[in-house]
A protein has these predicted regions:
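Peripheral, non-transmembrane regulatory/ligand-interaction domains of membrane transport proteins
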Residues: 1-94
Length: 94
């Protein structure tokens, strides 16, 4: 799923999908992407989106890197902390 966020006079406005307007979206959330969504994002921004498997395999020393003209930061975050079974997930910022 892709959600694009555009700047508005009152803040950020979410839009479903990849918005291809000028100015470009200020923020784009990528969650559980299909392969076609992944390819669309990679093409639109000329970046490579790491898979969940790739994010999990990154050593701590490799979680901040540059590839092409993009900077990548991958972090591990806890979630479901209020439950009996908290867990963690990896999240990348590009």
């Amino acid at each position: 799923m892709i959600t694009s966020y555009q700047r508005t006079p009152t803040g950020l406005a979410p839009s479903p999908g990849l918005v291809k307007t000028k100015p470009a979206p200020l923020w784009v959330d990528l969650s559980y992407l299909t392969r076609s969504e992944e390819l669309a994002v990679e093409s639109a921004f000329r970046i490579e989106v790491p898979t969940r498997e790739e994010m999990a395999d990154f050593e701590v020393s490799n979680r901040l890197y540059a590839y092409g003209e993009a900077l990548y930061l991958t972090i591990t975050l806890p979630y479901q902390l209020e439950t009996d079974f908290p867990t963690i997930t990896d999240l990348s910022f590009i």
